[in-house]
Amino acid sequence: DLQTIYEQIFNGHVERFDKKAKECAPFIVSASIGLIDKVAAKFLPTSVRFTYFWTMREMTNLFQNMCLAKDKYYGTGDSLAKLWCHECRRVLADRLITIDETKIIDDMIGECHADHLKKQGVSADVHLNDEEHANIFTTFTAVEPDGAYRPIDDLAQLSKVLEAKLVEYNESNAMMDLVLFDD
């Protein structure tokens, strides 16, 4: 079953992690399965919403990026839960069409977090609908050169890094004129 498959994958990845982080792995898997089941039941494909076709690919994408976490930075179940919230939003909500649908996904993530992780004492402490305290992870703004998948603490700093990367790209490639926005 899916629980066994993804639990084996994720347990293998978090094997070197702190004991508390390892203990939350099965609950992250069950929360993921529960969330994707809820999303698939709520957001059915239509002719307008043809991207609302949910498969195991979403689970695979979610755990592919969860497995970018390094034990050096994710020593607690709480930090893994925060990454899980980010990945769920990225993998699932990025395919949605309206902001209202994104808010529904955020609520579903919160419910699955409460049902599967909070009961185990694991708290992500994220504000999913709060743009001021965005829960964003990336590999390219870390100070360390190891390319670690880390949370963004400062959105202004993220904006500066993205603008610098765009300038760097434009110096060696065809000009790309992008507008960065918060959504």
Please describe what each predicted stretch is:
Residues 1-183:
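Alpha-helical lid/collar subdomain of P-loop NTPases
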